[in-house]
Amino acid sequence: MGCWGRNRGRLLCMLALTFMFMVLEVVVSRVTSSLAMLSDSFHMLSDVLALVVALVAERFARRTHATQKNTFGWIRAEVMGALVNAIFLTGLCFAILLEAIERFIEPHEMQQPLVVLGVGVAGLLVNVLGLCLFHHHSGFSQDSGHGHSHGGHGHGHGLPKGPRVKSTRPGSSDINVAPGEQGPDQEETNTLVANTSNSNGLKLDPADPENPRSGDTVEVQVNGNLVREPDHMELEEDRAGQLNMRGVFLHVLGDALGSVIVVVNALVFYFSWKGCSEGDFCVNPCFPDPCKAFVEIINSTHASVYEAGPCWVLYLDPTLCVVMVCILLYTTYPLLKESALILLQTVPKQIDIRNLIKELRNVEGVEEVHELHVWQLAGSRIIATAHIKCEDPTSYMEVAKTIKDVFHNHGIHATTIQPEFASVGSKSSVVPCELACRTQCALKQCCGTLPQAPSGKDAEKTPAVSISCLELSNNLEKKPRRTKAENIPAVVIEIKNMPNKQPESSL
């Protein structure tokens, strides 16, 4: 609740300031005919939308309790909000780029640069305040809270060391176990997502006012047992998962750059541009003039003809806008890429999947590893699932602990292992999957179709490799079929040998 309260207060404060200043910039841009100010007001509008998205995403992200329709809660709401902000900011950059190109083609003279300067300075102060509010979301740091699930067992790490957990298991004595330690009849709590539990197995948010059990203590399910722990036991804030707040920071940073551009452009225009005064005969060589010959005649006949300029001042505004667009795209692309890859459930870039498979296969007691999937839920919460084929069921728990350590070393702290045990007396060089799926559900699996395994003479030349469930099921159904002529004698023989029984056909 503390983290959500801090972020919510910052977002609401910045939202109010940004909205009021956006209205002010729209009015001033119309009065002064400043395209830079109008572009900055559009950027302010994008900030307002980004802050609204961030508020909604931040609120939903705190609902980490599982439901029947969403077993992971809304923990990915921040990632979705970050993606929306990044896409919106990218689109805004292209819109500003088009306006800058138009300004290069048809330059415009700024009206009342002092008014533009004052509004630009005020906007810069507002954005500096926003940068101070969200500066700690400009980067990433590693989070220490994580959890595991191995074949129905779970454990967690990274909880505060102060509070103790008291077991309420019927028929067992009260055992005080510090978080991160393991009691004799107790597994460590899965803390991938901080949950509370009700009798139906669904999780209730302790901060939810509709939760009748929210009070001084909350109940947490540990291997089917209810344990009570204080409300102040909160996981350390997952700064690595603050993609949404990072998107807000980038919006504020981009708007601060826009305010700097407005201020610089107004200062340069005020001190460098020499416009035409009222009542004086003046020409502006910076604009295309269809009456160029007539202007030359006037210049030759009039002794005092004023000339506006210099022309480079008019091109400073679009040039600075292009620089701002390049900076924004450079800072937005990593956020867009990271949030998109998380939603696509790709393997995190810090995970070496080949080395991970190699280490898992080298674990003593493991015959083969297949159906290994590694993906990122949000931030530093990385999840892995795998089928592990073991030799002996009695030693599986020891093997699972070793496998858990391997995943730990690779930064994967939430794992689900499906054990498979080798058949007694099986000495085949090919280690198949013991839980083959039906062939008709091949296209519905997460991996889709796989290449067929070699057969016949090619199989003898091929070294022993792992075979997937789909490959095994396909090979089992590839039996030689008899022709119609071959089936008839077989049926006749069965009738002669078994006259008192119903004939059976292998078709």
Swiss-Prot record:
Segments on the Extracellular face: 32-35, 100-113, 270-308
InterPro entries: Cation_efflux, Cation_efflux_CTD_sf, Cation_efflux_TMD_sf
Induction and repression of expression: Up-regulated by zinc (at protein level). Up-regulated in macrophages by LPS (at protein level).
Residues bound to Zn(2+): 43, 47, 251, 255
A family per Pfam: Cation_efflux
Post-translational modification: N-glycosylated at Asn-299. N-glycosylation promotes endocytosis and degradation through the proteasomal or lysosomal pathways.
Keywords: Antiport, Cell membrane, Cytoplasm, Cytoplasmic vesicle, Endoplasmic reticulum, Glycoprotein, Golgi apparatus, Ion transport, Membrane, Metal-binding, Nucleus, Phosphoprotein, Repeat, Transmembrane, Transmembrane helix, Transport, Zinc, Zinc transport
Polar residues bias: start-end ranges: 189-201
Residue ranges with Basic residues bias: 147-167
Segments crossing the lipid bilayer: 11-31, 36-56, 79-99, 114-134, 249-269, 309-329
Residue segments, region 6 X 2 AA approximate repeats of H-G: 146-158
Side of membrane Cytoplasmic, spans: 1-10, 57-78, 135-248, 330-507
Example of a GO cellular component annotation carried by this entry: nuclear membrane
Any Gene Ontology biological process: zinc ion transmembrane transport
Catalytic activity: Zn(2+)(in) + 2 H(+)(out) = Zn(2+)(out) + 2 H(+)(in)
Subcellular location: Cell membrane; Basolateral cell membrane; Cytoplasmic vesicle membrane; Cytoplasm
Molecular function terms, GO-annotated: calcium channel inhibitor activity; metal ion binding; zinc ion transmembrane transporter activity; zinc:proton antiporter activity
Region Disordered, residue ranges: 142-217
Modified residues (Phosphoserine): 506
Recorded superkingdom: Eukaryota
Positions of glycan attachment: 299
Quaternary structure and partners: Homodimer. Interacts with TMEM163. Interacts and forms a complex with TMC6 and TMC8; the interaction regulates zinc transport into the ER. (Microbial infection) Interacts with human papillomavirus 16/HPV16 protein E5; the interaction alleviates SLC30A1-mediated transcription factors inhibition.
Recorded family membership: Belongs to the cation diffusion facilitator (CDF) transporter (TC 2.A.4) family. SLC30A subfamily.
Name the UniProt record assigns to this protein: Proton-coupled zinc antiporter SLC30A1
UniProt gene name: SLC30A1
